[in-house]
Regions:
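Charged DNA-binding/catalytic regions of mobile-element recombinases
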Residues: 1-184
Length: 184
């Protein structure tokens, strides 16, 4: 069921995560790269590169996001993806349930149903893959992805969130929720 209905906004961090993966051609074969994105500030909260497109690699990206973020409001986080076999697999959906995360999937063959995740994939391809290729190996893609995710989260300015990096937008959200030291 699609709980997002193309509304890729969240009132706070860890309320809506979006997932998708893309592939990169290398001289040694394809590399598959999965991302988990927090919709609030478009921050990449989990990612994984793999030599195969099995469900385990998207599950690894989800595990990274769950470990890093440790979402506390059980029942308040929606995880949205396309209907790819990896995301509707028993292992993946069971892990979402175990973590108290509500699954949401778009319709078959409609990239607009996961447009924000597709946009992040497009930025990744434009800003690192096409710019720095051709790629020789899995390791080269994995390392470049690690560098790009750090740059994207901490230094890339995003117009939809106020021309600040995702980490800064999130920090501003949490700072606005802290009781003012001056009020005491």
């Amino acid at each position: 069921m699609d709980h997002v209905n193309r509304q890729f906004h969240a009132p706070a961090p860890d309320r809506l995560w979006l997932s998708d993966f893309t592939y990169v051609a290398t001289w040694a074969g394809f590399v598959y790269v999965a991302f988990v994105i927090d919709a609030y500030a478009r921050r990449i909260v989990g990612w994984r590169a793999s030599r195969t497109a099995h469900a385990s690699f998207v599950l690894d990206a989800l595990e990274q996001a769950l470990h890093e973020r440790r979402p506390l409001h059980r029942g308040g986080l929606i995880h949205h993806s396309d209907r790819g076999a990896q995301y509707v697999s028993i292992k993946y959906t069971e892990r979402l349930a175990q973590a108290g995360v509500e699954p949401s999937v778009g319709s078959v063959g409609d990239s607009y149903d996961n447009a924000l995740a597709e946009t992040i994939n497009g930025l990744y391809k434009a800003e690192v893959i096409h710019r720095r290729g051709p790629w020789r190996s899995f390791e080269a893609v994995e390392f470049a992805t690690l560098e790009w995710v750090d740059w994207f989260n901490n230094r890339r300015l995003l117009e939809p969130i106020g021309n600040v990096p995702p980490a800064e937008a999130e920090a501003a959200y949490y700072a606005s929720r802290q009781p003012s030291a001056m009020a005491a």
